[in-house]
Amino acid sequence: TKHTILHTNDVHSRLDPFPIDGTKYQGLGGVTKRAALIKKIRTEEKNVLLFDCGDIVQGTPYFNMFGGTPEYEMMNAMKYDASTLGNHDFDTGIQKLADLQSLATFPMINCNYDLKNTPMNGLTVPHRVFVKDGLKIGVYGVGIDLKGLVTSKQTGELVYHDPIEMGNAAAAILKHEMKCDLVICISHLGYKYKENKVSDVIMAQNSKDVDIILGGHTHTFLDKPDLIKNKEGELVMINQVGWAGIRLGRLDITFEKGGKNSCVSCDNMWVRN
């Protein structure tokens, strides 16, 4: 069976396309074009999942004026299956984030933030299983260390835990206890850094049981997914599609009998007319 995974990251309240003004991204992005592209893919493909990798908000006057509500309403309308938390999602404080998440028709997935003593208590899940055409796809989410990115006033009593350790624990539950055929991490750690800071690449190298990492934070435009060997020598696929909704990531995965999966095509599509 064929399964199509679509994903965005770091959309940053970009509801409109970039203006036609001679700049680098002119005419690209915009929710209407993204929604049309997603709708077209859903009419062509039977098994589609749509994820976001954080930083839904912050970056345009829409957010300054309306506080994130339109962004969440648009994601609801596009029927996102899940998102994870980015640092900028805390910019107006954790109470406001909780208010926005209560509007969402999609789960917010994160396994390495302890939110029990915050307004976000009960508004996130560590992982989620999606069943499509008899196939179990397990998804967990990880977030970046928020220290230095947002203040403790904005995050409240959020407690950060190591994303590699928590991620491996979540992946093990999904793969071995819940018997998922495919395990995906939606991450807001960042693709990679010059310094030895936890990133998607470092997480992949230290991982077990995860097949695909969909990333965000570093606004990295990957033309094709990166393949990294995990600690057992198996390949983990990493993908990220820049920022601002300029691209829509697409991974088409074919599952063969016997549990082997192979990526038949990986297309990071430009969102344009």
PLM features: residue spans?
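Acidic, metal/ion-coordinating pockets
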Residues: 1-272
